Amino acid sequence: MIEKDKISQILDLLEEAYPEAECALHHQNVFQLIVAVALSAQTTDKSVNQVTPALFAQYPTPQALAEADPEDVAAYIKRIGMYKTKSKNIVAMAQKLCSDFGGEVPDDYDALISLPGVGRKTANVVLSVGFGQPRIAVDTHVFRVANRIGLVHEKDVLKTELALMEEIPEERWSRTHHSLIFHGRQCCDARKPKCDVCPIHTYCEYVNGPETQG
């Protein structure tokens, strides 16, 4: 595993390389955010952004979505993966928001994961982006990049999240989440990483091996 002082240098370089790194899902409030994140599972943010404008125009509030027929909702999101399941989930989510939380998205982790269709990653994104809480949400990009370059060495998403929280200062958690996502999308591709133009290649275990990195 990379030493902590080098981890700090890696994070600095990633922040310099991706100063624009932020949540790529278009939203105007926390309700729209949680719906968009729930829809983004196994789907690109770009695809979600193509369907949410019409969806949010038709169902602008939790109350409106809670009263919707899932089949009608599905028609708005059929261009994304698992749209039938997701339409049922976001309607059920809205119903629970209205019945249990006064129509407001809660800012508590346990409350969030009690909502249909909301897992650990979605809850962490909402808490970080929507409420400004320090969180590291581990998606496929964060998992791949963090383990590939040697920030952590873990086999699953939860262990990766906990290990990153241990290695990275809390005040950098949210920023690191976005930087790793942008690096995974733009440079550290799953199949063909662009190591020749990578801003952190001198530190990367994938490039240099665990004994020679840095």
Mark where each language-model region is.
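Catalytic cores of DNA base-excision repair glycosylases
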Residues: 2-213
